[in-house]
Amino acid sequence: MRNTVLNTLNAFPTQLGSNKSTLSSKIFHSYLGVLRPPTPLNTSMEVLGEGAHQNREAKRSSLRFEFCSALKECQKGKVPFGSSLRLEAAENLTFECETGNYHTFCPISCVRWLYQQIADSFFLVIGTKTCGYFLQNAMGVMIFAEPRYAMAELEEGDIAAQLNDYKELKRLCLQIKHDRNPSVIVWIGTCTTEIIKMDLENLAKLIEAELKVPIVVARANGLDYAFTQGEDTVLASLVNRCPSSHESSLDSMKLPSGGREKQINDVNTSKPEGYLSEVISLTSNGDDINKKSCTKPVPKKSLVLFGSVPNSVQTQLTLELAKQGINVDGWLPSRYSELPVLNKDVYVCGINPFLSRTATSLMRRRKCHLISAPFPIGPDGTRRWIEKICTVLNTDKSSTSLEEVQKNLQQREEKVWKSLQSYLDLVKKKSVFFMGDNLLEISLARFFIRCGMIVYEIGIPYMDRRYQAAELALLEQTCLEMNVPLPRIVEKPDNYNQIQRIRELQPDIVVTGLAHSNPLEARGVTTKWSTEFTFAQIHGFANSRDVLELITRPVRRNQNLDALGFTSLVKN
């Protein structure tokens, strides 16, 4: 990956700002074979080379050149936002798909935050030395901290099928049970287990039956598009272990876990004698009892939220819904003995945009009802998220109650926006470019546009349009309300092409992964690590300030450098 990144940046100039006129007049795409002369808009472009792929890429480049010119005119203030410069190609959201490399973390990094979120659990990563080195670097802890995760290193004998996988995994799980006594063991499959076709599911069933410890298998390997999809895989596996009723949940808690019996005493079994006669004597006649017993109770609409966030964020979102009269019946993930009940009467709603597999498992396997809502990132997204849940789960269908909820949320959102005014002044009319890393790009771009920023391009490794339909609709609505051109969404972006587009657009901030951050900074491009948005608390009204704190940090850094007389961080 290192050589690929360096070769990608060879064509990048050392200082972008030193030769803007040359860059704007003549831009050479060596990879695509496209030479772009200084011609006016809507003119034909000469394509050097053969093949339909080059013609298609040349057409995309022409449309992108028009789009970039319109954005620059709007940004300079020559033409007001939302005027006739809104090109025909950008009236609707434009989706493009490239075949770029995925310079991102491995999805097994989900162990870093899930082992803390699922209490009394133990994560066993089954992979090679490379996986172990990655976990040591990405999840380094103190020696005496005793983390609840480990690495099962595959050797040559395992890959060549000379060793018995069942005996080795049973030995490791028996040692984990003896040392840590977990309530559940989660096996994390890697690329190697996929390539050699290890049957982890059947092995887990056999070992679970012998050790009496639940074993969940999640194939969070590096064959996915983004590292955040590791959490999606683990949650989709946990969906199958959730009970279908409260009785089955009690039975699951009675199962032996870690060699110790967890007894649950049912308080309803110890009723005093004559209890039923006392209840009957308090009623006027027996006919009323028969009528009441014949009426079927209205099924309660249960709400389960899925997505891994810190406990403080869970409390904040739960309280926000409680203010509107909505009770949260469970969270996924949670402690194994406290997994929520999932059946056809349960409504589920996600809080992260990278949980499409979990949403599919909830609907198809457990017959739950998915609430399609924008994600609670930023004041605008949090308000729409709560409004959609209240609209679906509000038992009182009167328009007065819904209008009151919308009024309260609107006042709350306006109050939050006023508290963020100091950050909004910094980011207003700043341009941002997303290279794509963690699948949070659509939600973050929508929030930044609402803050007054201009988003040139949203690169995203993978996107499920059905799962993010509400978020995409809100993004389009936000652009119309803010009178800014709609950004282009590029799925699986090619890094070389992105470098050329960054050279054309010259954005103020580039949100990128760790692989490209330092090389771009060395070329004079202000960057922001997308990984920071993954691990920061960005959900809900209260955490909107943290999102703006992250995106304005490079802006404030550049302002401080200007005050000190420095023009860049790199020595000329």
From Swiss-Prot:
EC assignment: 1.3.7.7
Cofactor: [4Fe-4S] cluster
Pathway involvement of the protein, from the record: Porphyrin-containing compound metabolism; chlorophyll biosynthesis (light-independent)
Any GO MF annotation of the entry: 4 iron, 4 sulfur cluster binding
Keywords: 4Fe-4S, ATP-binding, Chlorophyll biosynthesis, Chloroplast, Iron, Iron-sulfur, Metal-binding, Nucleotide-binding, Oxidoreductase, Photosynthesis, Plastid
Similarity comment: family membership: Belongs to the BchN/ChlN family.
Protein name from the UniProt record: Light-independent protochlorophyllide reductase subunit N
Species assigned in the record: Oltmannsiellopsis viridis
Gene this chain is encoded by: chlN
